[in-house]
């Protein structure tokens, strides 16, 4: 009798491809929710994203066990970690009915990031033993920074929801009444809290990065492109939060600031990473 082989020998990249496919399916279904004005409580996107998270988690776990360290060592792994954070927090928020539609706004971002991460140059093949790890601080500072970017990504999703709801209230009042999206006040509160949490993670990541740099280079700061870039991002979000705290910004301006800042992070992170001598030490050595 012929044996049926189970897909237990799939590579981590195969699991990740399957997860990205599910994110794409969620994105396509989300188009119908957008067109209907989010007037129906729907579990489909939530369920598809949950399935994607399971596959995504398996992919990251397999990569981590193979490396025997936190799997954040190149652009593919960093992108996958950011995506995982966004999906996980989205599913937790989706427990509450009014925030279940966050997935409809997050799925396009997840699909685009997933396709981008699968580009061949994002995950170069290295010889056995090519990875170098320097203990807990190495994994800690990467994890904190990636978690913070995931939090900023979720706040940007909240900003899109806020701007969508605000537009409906102005242009399509009847559709806004029937919509199951949260109120503008709740969305603004959620945005603000997400930015504060992500900012705290970014601050902790900067401290851990400085400690890690001192561990390996005996200096607390180095004029590296990525370090300067992260400090610039930190300063921008600090100003954004201070202005929001003092009620200088309206909810609409805060939403645009949150969305614009994350788009800046999304579009510039990859280039800065490639320009960073600290993160391209292996390439310089070769």
Language-model regions: role of each:
Residues 1-2, 286:
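Low-complexity, proline/glycine-enriched hydrophobic segments characteristic of transmembrane helices
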Residues 8, 127, 174-177:
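General secondary-structure edge motif
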Residues 169-185:
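Juxtamembrane inter-helical linkers in multi-pass membrane proteins
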Residues 125-140:
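Interhelical loops and loop-helix junctions of multi-pass membrane transporters/channels
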Residues 11-126, 144-167, 186-215, 222-286:
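Hydrophobic cores of alpha-helical transmembrane segments in multi-pass integral membrane proteins
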Residues 65-67, 132-133, 182:
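Residue-level signal for pocket-adjacent positions within structured domains
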Residues 2-9, 132-133:
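Juxtamembrane membrane-water interface segments that cap and precede transmembrane helices
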């Amino acid at each position: 009798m012929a044996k049926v082989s189970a897909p237990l020998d799939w590579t981590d990249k195969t699991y990740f491809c399957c997860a990205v496919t599910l994110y794409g399916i969620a994105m396509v279904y989300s188009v119908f929710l957008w067109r209907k004005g989010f007037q129906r409580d729907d579990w489909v996107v939530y369920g598809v994203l949950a399935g994607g998270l399971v596959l995504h988690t398996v992919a990251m776990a397999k990569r981590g066990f193979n490396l025997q360290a936190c799997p954040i060592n190149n652009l593919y792994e960093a992108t996958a970690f950011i995506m995982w954070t966004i999906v996980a927090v989205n599913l937790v928020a989706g427990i509450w009915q009014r925030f279940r539609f966050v997935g409809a706004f997050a799925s396009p971002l997840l699909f685009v990031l997933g396709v981008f991460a699968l580009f061949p140059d994002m995950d170069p093949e290295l010889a056995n033993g090519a990875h170098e790890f320097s203990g807990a601080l190495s994994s800690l500072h990467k994890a904190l920074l990636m978690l913070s970017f995931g939090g900023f990504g979720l706040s940007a999703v909240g900003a899109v929801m806020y701007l969508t709801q605000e537009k409906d209230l102005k242009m399509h009042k009847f559709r806004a009444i029937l919509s199951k999206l949260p109120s503008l006040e709740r969305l603004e509160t959620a945005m603000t809290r997400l930015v504060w949490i992500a900012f705290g993670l970014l601050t902790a990541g900067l401290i851990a990065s400085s400690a890690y740099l001192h561990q390996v280079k005996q200096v607390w700061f180095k004029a590296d492109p990525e370090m300067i870039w992260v400090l610039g991002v930190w300063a921008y979000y600090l100003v954004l939060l201070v202005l929001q705290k003092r009620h200088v910004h309206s909810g609409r301006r805060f939403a645009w600031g949150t969305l614009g800042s994350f788009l800046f992070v999304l579009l510039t992170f990859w280039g800065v990473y490639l320009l960073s001598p600290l993160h391209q030490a292996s390439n310089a050595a070769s």
